[in-house]
């Protein structure tokens, strides 16, 4: 059985050239309220090498679908020549370490995270990019999605 079978989708990852423009476009079309788009320094392992990247990431939720928006960074997995591009699908497993190990054994290339990490980005041999997260990271992400839903509810109540 595939290690991805039955895993819940956490979010659709998007990469953009300009965070402000992408948020405005997506907010209008999907009625989203974006949470926390500040730049932060992230110590990561990218393409097998430890790096420190200045990333700008925002999260939003419609209540039915969740989104992660990442501003493009050259020489990383987060690149695009388009204004906005669908980038990855994020899946959750309470056994994320085992899922990550199984994906590597099946030939998926780890793009984000060190070998043995309980989460990361994996690219299948045909190019599909998948993010695997465990319980701790899921709780962190869900906090953003709940904030987004509350902000959207307040905006709708005020309208």
Task: Give the positions of each predicted feature.
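Conserved short beta-strand elements that form part of the metal-binding/catalytic scaffold
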Residues: 33-80, 122-139
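Core segments of cupin and vicinal oxygen chelate
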Residues: 4, 15-63, 98-99, 105-115, ...
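A short, polar/charged loop-to-alpha-helix boundary motif
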Residues: 139-148
């Amino acid at each position: 059985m595939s290690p991805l079978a039955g895993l819940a989708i956490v979010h659709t990852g998007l990469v953009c050239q300009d965070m402000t423009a992408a948020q405005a476009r997506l907010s209008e079309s999907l009625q989203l309220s974006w949470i926390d788009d500040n730049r932060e320094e992230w110590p990561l392992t990218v393409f097998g090498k430890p790096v420190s990247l200045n990333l700008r990431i925002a999260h939003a939720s419609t209540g039915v679908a969740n989104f992660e928006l990442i501003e493009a960074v050259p020489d990383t997995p987060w690149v695009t020549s388009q204004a906005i591009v669908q980038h990855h699908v994020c899946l959750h497993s309470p056994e994320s370490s085992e899922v990550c190990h199984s994906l590597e054994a099946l030939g998926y290339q780890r793009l984000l995270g060190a070998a043995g990490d309980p989460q990361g980005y994996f690219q299948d041999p045909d190019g599909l990019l998948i993010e695997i997260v465990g319980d701790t990271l899921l709780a962190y992400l869900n906090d953003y999605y709940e904030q987004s839903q509350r902000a959207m509810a307040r905006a709708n109540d005020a309208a």
